[in-house]
Amino acid sequence: TPPAVAAALSVRGTTLTGTGARGDQPPALHPLVQDFLDTLTSERRERFTGRCAEAVLLSRHLTEADATRTARSKRAARRPMTPGEARKALKGAKLTTRHIREDGDPLHGAFAPPCRSCTALAEHFGVRVIDPTLQD
């Protein structure tokens, strides 16, 4: 199970929020997100890879962008989204994650750095991970 974190993905004025997936079945990720995670070498994988809030939010955003792309063009509808189109859809994206803990736990609400897999995923798609505690 991934650590308990909440994440926010902001892309050009739109913000998606969510948490990691905790059920028996892993979440259905966007094919480009799943493909990237499937290619990670063992030293860049976590045992919960693909269940983190970051992977879930990137998938949600790309799924929405993909639906918009295919609705606009019959040609686009006949082929899957490319990694370049995904990066373009995520241009300027910022991602932050915070710990979810019990009331009174000093870690509750603190910045939660992404795991190795999500760090690589964010870099791959050009998404900036923001630590709000380092902002002025």
PLM regions with names:
Residues 1-136:
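Zinc-dependent deaminase catalytic domain
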